[in-house]
From Swiss-Prot:
Tissues where this protein is expressed: Brain-specific.
Keywords noted in UniProt: Cell cycle, Cell division, Cell membrane, Cell projection, Centromere, Chromosome, Cytoplasm, Cytoskeleton, Golgi apparatus, Kinetochore, Membrane, Microtubule, Mitosis, Phosphoprotein, Repeat
Organism lineage: Eukaryota, Metazoa, Chordata, Craniata, Vertebrata
Region entry Interaction with microtubules, MAPRE1 and MAPRE3, spans: 444-580
Basic and acidic residues biased stretches: 411-425, 955-972
Effect of K839A: Decreases affinity for microtubules
Ranges where the record places region Disordered: 1-61, 314-368, 409-467, 488-557, 617-645, 878-928, 952-995
Name of the molecule in the record: CLIP-associating protein 2
Biased composition (Low complexity): 316-334, 453-467, 627-641
Effect on the protein upon substituting S541D: Phosphomimetic mutant that reduces MAPRE1 binding
UniProt entry tagged with the keyword Transmembrane: no
Residue numbers bearing the Phosphothreonine modification: T787
Effect of substituting S525D: Phosphomimetic mutant that reduces MAPRE1 binding
Organism for this UniProt entry: Homo sapiens (Human)
Residue spans of biased composition, Gly residues class: 47-61
C-alpha cells in the first residue's frame, strides 16, 4: 500500500484532530537517557516518524497540540542547576505547595510545572530523594490536570509526558494515578485540553509499561462518551504495538473481552478502531485471538475479514479464512511475519543502509522475531562488520541465509523501506521474489504471504527443515527452492488446525522456536507437554552461572537479556537459561553446514548472558516463583513485570515501589510488596529515615489486615527480618510493635500464624533494650484506654515474666507507672474469670521480686496496705512452696551440691537467668532454703512487711550523703543493697538460718540510698530521676565515674555545645524545612540521654522555649516530635523544670486539643511524665485553676494529670492542698462531658486512697446519687486492690 494510502487511511477518523498525519517527521526524545533507563518499548515508537498529533493548522483545529509541540516543550524551559539533594527537596516541596493550592495564580502554577521539567533536564532523576518526592506530587499533578485553565492543563500534560519519557517504568505510580484524569480531558470541547490529554496518554503508553494501566484503558473502552471510546481503542492499539507480551499476559482475558465489545460497539468509528486492535491481539495471543474470532457472529466475522483484507492483513485471520497458514510459526510470532521465511530479500532490505532515523530513540529495541536462523544474525553481523550495503534490495549469494532478517537495534538505522502509518519502517519486497507468495502489505507495512512453509502434524519429527523455521540453508537459491517446495505442498492442507497439547513433543524445532519467540511462555504447548517446560526450570540449568545478572542498563521493556552485537540470533532468551539456549543452537546443527556456521551458532549461544530468576525465600515453597512449571516470564521471573530487571532487584527506586505495594488496597499487591521487602532486607538493604517512617505506618495498619491467611502470615515473617535489620532505628515504634503483637496473641488465629506472632515477640524481646521494653509494658498495663481480653492479659503477663528473666536488676525502674502496673498485676492475681490470668500474674510478681528484691520491696512499701497484703501473702506462699520443694529434693543427686549463701538468694543480682539453670524446682527459681522451715519464713516475711510499713525516710541532708560516701558503689553496689551485696557469688555459711537471710533483706531496705526510693512524702526531684545533684562534669566524675574519668574528655561539652547551637538554629525555622527540623529533633532527643550537664546548663532555657514554641507548628509530626523530646528531657532532667513548671504544664495541656491523634498521644505521654517529674505541690497549684476554668479536652487532661500527682502526695500535704483541689473536682463532676465526670470520680477515689474518711467533709455539695456512685468506685478500688474494710463509706453510712 502506498504512502499516500497510508496517510488517507490515517486521516479518515478523527475525533479531535490528533491522528497521525505524516510518517515523515521523526519522533525525537531530547531527554537524556542512560542505558539503564531505556524508552521501554519493544519497537521504536517512532523510528521513522512517530505518530503526530495534528497541530493548530491541521485537522485538529485551532488550539490543538501535537506531539512535536510536547517534545519541544520538554526542553523549552528555564535552565536550573541542582547542587545538593537538600536543595532539590526544598524546590520540590515549594512546587508541591504551589500546585496543591489552586488559589495560587495560574501562571505561578504553570511555571511550577515547567520547573519540574527543568529539574528533570538538570538530572533530578539521579537523586534518590526525587522519587520519594515524586510520590508526593501525584495529587498535585492530578489537581493541575483538572484545572479550569487550559494553559495549566497543557503544562501538566507536558510535564507528565516528560516524566514518563525520562523515567520510563519508574514513573509507574504517577502514571497510574494521572491516567484516569487524562481520560477525562479527552471529550473536552477545548481542543488544547483534549489533544494535550491524548498526547500525554500516548507518551505514557509508549514509555511506561505498567500492567496496572491496562484496566484503566480498557474500562474507558466502555465509556458512555463516544470520543472516549474511540480514543480508548486507539490507545489500546498503540499499547498492543508497543508493549511486550509478558506485560500483557495478566490481563489477556480483559483485553479479549474489551476488543470483543469494541467490535460490537454502536459507533462505527469505534468499531474500526477495535478491529485494528484485533491485529495487535493476534500478534501477542494468537490462540485467544482465534477463539475471539470464532466466537463472533458471522456478520462480524465478515466485517473483520473484510477490514483485514483491505489493510493487507488477511494472514492474521484464522486458518478457515485464508488459503494457507502455519500451524506453528504464527503461534510463536509476535508480529505475524509469515512472509519472512520465504523472502530472503527482506534481509537485504533491513540490513541495507538507508536514511531512516530508526535510532532516534536511544535504548529502544525492535520487537524480536521468532523465525530467525542461528546463522542469520551471525551472517548479518559479519555482513555489517564488512561494511557491505545492498541498496538495491537484493541479497548477494552467501551473504545471508534464506529467511533471515535483522530486526536489530544495531542495524535498525540502516533500513531501506517504506514508512508505515505509525511511522515504522518496513522492508520493501524486492522484484525477484515478489510473486513468490502473493505478498501483501498490511496497514502497518508488514509484508505477508499467503503461502508459507507448513508441515503436517504427523510429519514433524521427520521434518528437520522445520528446525528454526526452515531457514537453515547456506545459500539463497537452495533456501528459495526449499521454501517453494514446502509452500506448494502446504497449499493442499490449508485447513489444518493449530497443533494442540501433546502433539508438539515430537517436533525438534519446538524448543528453538519457543526460544526465539517473544511470547514469554516456558512451553508453547498449551496442553500436557512438559518437555519444553524444562526451559523455565531453575534446577536443570548446568551452565546458568556463565554470567550472573544482566547489567542494569539493558532494556527494561523488551524483557530480553541484551546481546551486545546481534539481537535475536538464537532468540532473545526471554528469561530462558543458558543451557536451554545452547541446546537450541546445537539442535539446529543437525541441518547446519559444517564449519564456520556451526562455530558461530555455538559462540552466539554462549554469548547470551545467563539469566537469574528472582528467588523467593524458603518460607514460600508454594509460591509460583519456585514452581517448575512456572512461566519463564511469570511475575517474578527475570524479565518480569515492567522490565528486564525485576521490580525487587532495583535498589533505590524499588524501595518506593515496594512500599507502594505494601500500602496497596489490593491484598495480592501487598503480598508482593512484602515479598520484595523481604528480599531487600535479606540483602541487608537498609532503609532511610523517611522510608522507615512510612514503613512503620504501613506495618501499623497491617496489624489489622483482614486477609490474615494470605497476607498477615507473610507480614509477620517480613516483620521479623525488619526488626533484625533495623532494631536500632525502631525504638520510637516499639510501643506500637509490642502492644500490637501482644494484642494479636489474644486474637483467634491459626496455630501456624500464632506461632509466627510468638516468634516476632521473641525476636522483639531479644532486639530491644530491656528497660525500654519494661517501661512500655508497664505503660501498656496501666493504659486506661485499653481493655485487654483475658488472652491478651495472659500474653502481657507471660511476656513480662520472660523479660524479667533476662533483665538486669538495674533495669527495674521504680517509677509511678511501675507501681501502678504492679498494683494492677496484683489485682489480676484474683481474676475471677480465668485461672490462666491468675497464675500468670502470680508468676510475674514472683519474677519481679526475684529480679530486684530490694527495689521491689520498696515498691510494695509505697502501695496501699490492701495491695501489700495481697502481694505479701503470695510471696509468702511462694517462699514456703519453694522451701518445701527444695527440702524434698535434697537427697536427689541432681540437686546442686553446693548450697548458696542466704545473702545470695536475697540479692537482687540473683536474676532468674543466673539461677534457673541450676535447679529443677517447679518455679524455676533457685532458692537455697534447705535449712528453712515454714514458720521461720512466715515470721521473717512478716518482719519485712512491718519494716516496709514503718520505714522512715531520711532528711534531705541524709539523702545527699550516700551519694558522696558511696560514690563508686552508687550505680552498682549500693543500688543492690550495699557493699555486702556486690558479689552475687559471695560465699557464706551454708548453714545460715532463714532468719539471717530475711534480716539481710530487711537491713537492705534501710541501707539503700534514699534517692532510689520510689515515693517520698516530701518532694525531692531525685526520687523521680537518675540525674545527679551537681550538674557539672567534675561532680559527675566524683560521684559516679572516678575510675572512668578519662571517658569524659574536656572538649566533649564543647563539641556538644556546638552541636546544640546548630540544632537550635535549625529548630528556629518555624513552619519551614520540615525534614531538617525532624532530624534536629531526633538529634536533640539523643542528646537528652547524654549527661553533658554543662551543655544543658547553657542551653536549657533556649531549648525549652523553642520546643514549646514548636508545639504551634503547622506540621503535626513536628508537634508530636517536640512533645516527645520534651518528655525525654522531663524524664532525664526533671529538676530543671522547677522555674518553668507552669509554662510547661500549660503548653502540654493545650496540645491535647490538637486534631491529630499522634500529637494528642504524645501530649498524654508528656503529661504523664510531667506529673511524676515536678514538685507535686507546685504541679497541683498549677492544675487547680486550669481544671476550674478550662474547656474540654484541656480540663480532662488536667484532671488525669492531677490524679497521677495525688498518688505521689503525702497525707499531710494533701490535707493542706484539699481546699484548692476539691472545688474543681466538684465542678467537674457536673460537667456535660461524661469522660470529664468519670475522670473527676477517679481523682476523688485517688484522694480517698491517700486521706481516707477525711475526704468526707469536702463532699457535702454532692447529691445522693453522685455520692452513691463515688462510694461504688471507692469500694471497687479497695476490693480490686486486695480487699478493704467493708465499712468504709465516705457518705457516712455503714
Amino acid at each position: 500500500m502506498a504512502m499516500g494510502d497510508d496517510k488517507s487511511f490515517d486521516d479518515e477518523e478523527s475525533v479531535d484532530g490528533n491522528r497521525p498525519s505524516s510518517a515523515a517527521s521523526a519522533f525525537k526524545v531530547p531527554a537524556p537517557k542512560t542505558s539503564g533507563n531505556p524508552a521501554n518499548s519493544a519497537r521504536k515508537p517512532g523510528s521513522a516518524g512517530g505518530p503526530k498529533v495534528g497541530g493548530a493548522s491541521k485537522e485538529g483545529g485551532a488550539g490543538a497540540v501535537d506531539e512535536d509541540d510536547f517534545i519541544k516543550a520538554f526542553t523549552d524551559v528555564p535552565s536550573i542547576q541542582i547542587y545538593s539533594s537538600r536543595e532539590l527537596e526544598e524546590t520540590l516541596n515549594k512546587i508541591r505547595e504551589i500546585l496543591s493550592d489552586d488559589k495560587h495564580d495560574w501562571d505561578q502554577r504553570a511555571n511550577a510545572l515547567k520547573k519540574i521539567r527543568s529539574l528533570l533536564v538538570a538530572g533530578a532523576a539521579q537523586y534518590d530523594c526525587f522519587f520519594q518526592h515524586l510520590r508526593l506530587l501525584d495529587g498535585a499533578l492530578k489537581l493541575s490536570a483538572k484545572d479550569l485553565r487550559s494553559q495549566v492543563v497543557r503544562e501538566a500534560c507536558i510535564t507528565v509526558a516528560h516524566l514518563s519519557t525520562v523515567l520510563g517504568n519508574k514513573f509507574d505510580h504517577g502514571a497510574e494515578a494521572i491516567v484516569p484524569t487524562l481520560f477525562n480531558l479527552v471529550p473536552n470541547s477545548a481542543k488544547v485540553m483534549a489533544t494535550s490529554g491524548c498526547a500525554a496518554i500516548r507518551f505514557i503508553i509508549r514509555h511506561t509499561h505498567v500492567p496496572r494501566l491496562i484496566p484503566l484503558i480498557t474500562s474507558n473502552c466502555t465509556s458512555k462518551s463516544v470520543p472516549v471510546r474511540r480514543r480508548s481503542f486507539e490507545f489500546l492499539d498503540l499499547l498492543l504495538q508497543e508493549w511486550q507480551t509478558h506485560s500483557l499476559e495478566r490481563h489477556a482475558a480483559v483485553l479479549v473481552e474489551t476488543i470483543k465489545k469494541g467490535i460490537h460497539d454502536a459507533d462505527a468509528e469505534a468499531r474500526v478502531e477495535a478491529r485494528k486492535t484485533y491485529m495487535g491481539l493476534r500478534n501477542h495471543f494468537p490462540g485467544e485471538a482465534e477463539t475471539l474470532y470464532n466466537s463472533l457472529e458471522p456478520s462480524y466475522q465478515k466485517s473483520l475479514q473484510t477490514y483485514l483484507k483491505s489493510s493487507g492483513s488477511v494472514a492474521s485471520l484464522p486458518q478457515s479464512d485464508r488459503s494457507s497458514s502455519s500451524s506453528q510459526e504464527s503461534l510463536n510470532r509476535p508480529f505475524s511475519s509469515k512472509w519472512s521465511t520465504a523472502n530472503p530479500s527482506t534481509v537485504a532490505g533491513r540490513v541495507s543502509a538507508g536514511s531512516s532515523k530508526a535510532s532516534s530513540l536511544p535504548g529502544s529495541l525492535q520487537r524480536s522475531r521468532s523465525d530467525i536462523d542461528v546463522n542469520a544474525a551471525a551472517g548479518a553481523k559479519a555482513h555489517h562488520a564488512a561494511g557491505q550495503s545492498v541498496r538495491s534490495g537484493r541479497l548477494g549469494a552467501g551473504a545471508l541465509n534464506a529467511g533471515s532478517y535483522a530486526s536489530l537495534e544495531d542495524t535498525s538505522d540502516k533500513l531501506d523501506g517504506t514508512a508505515s502509518e505509525d511511522g515504522r519502517v518496513r522492508a520493501k519486497l524486492s522484484a525477484p521474489l515478489a510473486g513468490m507468495g502473493n505478498a501483501k502489505a498490511d496497514s502497518r507495512g508488514r509484508s505477508r504471504t499467503k503461502m508459507v512453509s507448513q508441515s503436517q502434524p504427523g510429519s514433524r519429527s521427520g521434518s528437520p527443515g522445520r528446525v528454526l523455521t526452515t531457514t537453515a540453508l547456506s545459500t539463497v537459491s537452495s533456501g528459495v527452492q526449499r521454501v517453494l517446495v514446502n509452500s506448494a505442498s502446504a497449499q493442499k492442507r490449508s485447513k489444518i488446525p493449530r497443533s494442540q497439547g501433546c502433539s508438539r513433543e515430537a517436533s525438534p524445532s519446538r524448543l528453538s522456536v519457543a526460544r526465539s519467540s517473544r511470547i514469554p511462555r516456558p512451553s508453547v504447548s498449551q496442553g500436557c507437554s512438559r518437555e519444553a517446560s524444562r526451559e523455565s526450570s531453575r534446577d536443570t540449568s548446568p551452565v546458568r552461572s556463565f554470567q550472573p545478572l544482566a547489567s542494569r542498563h539493558h532494556s527494561r521493556s523488551t524483557g530480553a537479556l541484551y546481546a551486545p552485537e546481534v539481537y535475536g540470533a538464537s532468540g532473545p532468551g526471554y528469561g530462558i537459561s543458558q543451557s536451554s539456549r545452547l541446546s537450541s543452537s546445537v539442535s539446529a546443527m543437525r541441518v547446519l553446514n559444517t564449519g564456520s556456521d556451526v562455530e558461530e551458532a555455538v559462540a552466539d549461544a554462549l554469548k547470551k548472558p545467563a539469566r537469574r530468576r528472582y528467588e523467593s525465600y524458603g518460607m514460600h515453597s508454594d509460591d509460583d516463583a519456585n514452581s517448575d512449571a512456572s512461566s519463564a516470564c511469570s511475575e517474578r521471573s527475570y524479565s518480569s513485570r515492567n522490565g528486564s530487571i525485576p521490580t525487587y532487584m532495583r535498589q533505590t527506586e524499588d524501595v518506593a515501589e515496594v512500599l507502594n505495594r505494601c500500602a496497596s488496597s489490593n491484598w495480592s499487591e501487598r503480598k508482593e510488596g512484602l515479598l520484595g521487602l523481604q528480599n531487600l532486607l535479606k540483602n541487608q538493604r537498609t532503609l532511610s529515615r523517611v522510608e522507615l517512617k512510612r514503613l512503620c505506618e504501613i506495618f501499623t495498619r497491617m496489624f489489622a489486615d483482614p486477609h490474615g491467611k494470605r497476607v498477615f502470615s507473610m507480614f509477620l515473617e517480613t516483620l521479623v527480618d525488619f526488626i533484625q535489620v533495623h532494631k536500632d532505628d525502631l525504638q520510637d515504634w516499639l510501643f506500637v510493635l509490642l502492644t500490637q503483637l501482644l494484642k494479636k496473641m489474644g486474637a483467634d488465629l491459626l496455630g501456624s500464624v500464632q506461632a509466627k506472632v510468638q516468634k516476632a515477640l521473641d525476636v522483639t524481646r531479644e532486639s530491644f533494650p530491656n528497660d525500654l521494653q519494661f517501661n512500655i509494658l508497664m505503660r501498656f498495663t496501666v493504659d486506661q484506654t485499653q481493655t485487654p481480653s483475658l488472652k491478651v492479659k495472659v500474653a502481657i503477663l507471660k511476656y513480662i515474666e520472660t523479660l524479667a528473666k533476662q533483665m538486669d536488676p538495674g533495669d527495674f525502674i521504680n517509677s509511678s507507672e511501675t507501681r501502678l502496673a504492679v498494683s494492677r498485676v496484683i489485682t489480676w492475681t484474683t481474676e475471677p474469670k480465668s485461672s490462666d490470668v491468675r497464675k500468670a500474674a502470680q508468676s510475674v510478681l514472683i519474677s519481679l521480686f526475684e529480679l530486684n528484691t530490694p527495689e521491689f520491696t520498696m515498691l510494695l512499701g509505697a502501695l496501699p496496705k490492701t495491695f501489700q497484703d495481697g502481694a505479701t501473702k503470695l510471696l509468702h506462699n511462694h517462699l514456703r512452696n519453694t522451701g518445701n520443694g527444695t527440702q524434698s529434693s535434697m537427697g536427689s543427686p541432681l540437686t546442686r551440691p553446693t548450697p548458696r549463701s542466704p545473702a545470695n538468694w536475697s540479692s537482687p543480682l540473683t536474676s532468674p537467668t543466673n539461677t534457673s539453670q541450676n535447679t529443677l524446682s517447679p518455679s524455676a527459681f533457685d532458692y537455697d532454703t534447705e535449712n528453712m522451715n515454714s514458720e521461720d519464713i512466715y515470721s521473717s516475711l512478716r518482719g519485712v512487711t512491718e519494716a516496709i510499713q514503718n520505714f522512715s525516710f531520711r532528711s534531705q541532708e541524709d539523702m545527699n550523703e550516700p551519694l558522696k560516701r558511696d560514690s563508686k558503689k552508687d550505680d552498682g553496689d549500693s543500688m543492690c543493697g550495699g557493699p555486702g551485696m556486690s558479689d552475687p557469688r559471695a560465699g557464706g555459711d551454708a548453714t545460715d538460718s532463714s532468719q539471717t537471710a530475711l534480716d539481710n533483706k530487711a537491713s537492705l531496705l534501710h541501707s539503700m540510698p534514699t534517692h532510689s526510693s520510689p515515693r517520698s512524702r516530701d518532694y525531692n526531684p531525685y526520687n523521680y530521676s537518675d540525674s545527679i545533684s551537681p550538674f557539672n562534669k567534675s561532680a559527675l566524675k566524683e560521684a559516679m565515674f572516678d575510675d572512668d574519668a578519662d571517658q569524659f574528655p574536656d572538649d566533649l561539652s564543647l563539641d556538644h555545645s556546638d552541636l546544640v547551637a546548630e540544632l537550635l538554629k535549625e529548630l528556629s525555622n518555624h513552619n519551614e524545612r520540615v525534614e531538617e527540623r525532624k532530624i534536629a529533633l531526633y538529634e536533640l532527643m539523643k542528646l537528652t540521654q547524654e549527661e553533658s550537664f554543662s551543655v544543658w546548663d547553657e542551653h536549657f532555657k533556649t531549648i525549652l522555649l523553642l520546643l514549646l514554641e514548636t508545639l504551634g507548628d503547622k506540621e503535626p509530626t513536628i508537634r508530636a516530635l517536640a512533645l516527645k523530646v520534651l518528655r525525654e528531657i522531663l524524664r532525664h532532667q526533671p529538676a530543671r523544670f522547677k522555674n518553668y513548671a507552669e509554662l510547661t504544664v500549660m503548653k502540654t495541656l493545650e496540645a491535647h486539643k490538637d486534631p491529630h491523634k499522634e500529637v494528642v498521644r504524645s501530649a498524654e505521654e508528656a503529661a504523664s511524665v510531667l506529673a511524676t517529674s515536678i514538685s507535686p505541690e507546685q504541679c497541683i497549684k498549677v492544675l487547680c485553676p486550669i481544671i476550674q476554668t478550662a474547656d474540654y479536652p484541656i480540663n480532662l487532661a488536667a484532671i488525669k494529670m492531677q490524679t497521677k500527682v495525688i498518688e505521689r502526695v503525702s497525707k499531710e500535704t494533701l490535707n493542706l492542698l484539699l481546699p484548692e483541689i476539691m472545688p474543681g473536682l466538684i465542678q467537674g463532676y457536673d460537667n456535660s462531658e461524661s469522660s470529664v465526670r468519670k475522670a473527676c470520680v477517679f481523682c476523688l477515689v485517688a484522694v480517698h486512697a491517700v486521706i481516707g474518711d477525711e475526704l468526707k467533709p469536702h463532699l457535702s455539695q454532692l447529691t445522693g446519687s453522685k455520692m452513691k456512685l463515688l462510694n461504688l468506685y471507692i469500694k471497687r478500688a479497695q476490693t480490686g486492690s486486695g480487699g478493704a474494710d467493708p465499712t468504709t463509706d465516705v457518705s457516712g453510712q455503714s
